[in-house]
Amino acid sequence: MVNMKASMFLTFAGLVLLLVVCYASESEEKEFPKEMLSSIFAVDNDFKQEERDCAGYMRECKEKLCCSGYVCSSRWKWCVLPAPWRR
């Protein structure tokens, strides 16, 4: 009877240990793609900002000219889409 209780306890402890190891491994795997994607997009955004000499949509246009397809709003000093009612 004691031997059966000990074997059940060891089996239960082994399953708990296996669960903890699997959870830790899975959480590491989930973090890796997130870190990889965030580093790719961070580098990509930095590259785009260095490449531009013009201001994009809803960016300040006091010192920079707006990119093609946008006009500088005289009221807000932001680059906006051109429209007939904006003069």
Curated annotation (Swiss-Prot):
Keywords: Disulfide bond, Ion channel impairing toxin, Knottin, Secreted, Signal, Toxin
Record carries keyword Aminoacyl-tRNA synthetase: no
Taxonomic superkingdom: Eukaryota
Propeptide residue range(s): 25-52
Tissue: Expressed by the venom gland.
Any single GO CC term annotated in Swiss-Prot or TrEMBL for this entry: extracellular region
Signal peptide, first to last residue: 1-24
Pfam families linked to this entry: Toxin_12 (PF07740)
GO terms, molecular function: ion channel inhibitor activity; toxin activity
Subcellular location: Secreted
Disulfide bridge partners, by residue number: 54-67, 61-72, 66-79
Family: Belongs to the neurotoxin 10 (Hwtx-1) family. 51 (Hntx-8) subfamily. Hntx-8 sub-subfamily.
Record's function text: Ion channel inhibitor.
Domain remark from Swiss-Prot or TrEMBL: The presence of a 'disulfide through disulfide knot' structurally defines this protein as a knottin.
Name under which the protein is recorded: U3-theraphotoxin-Hhn1a 15
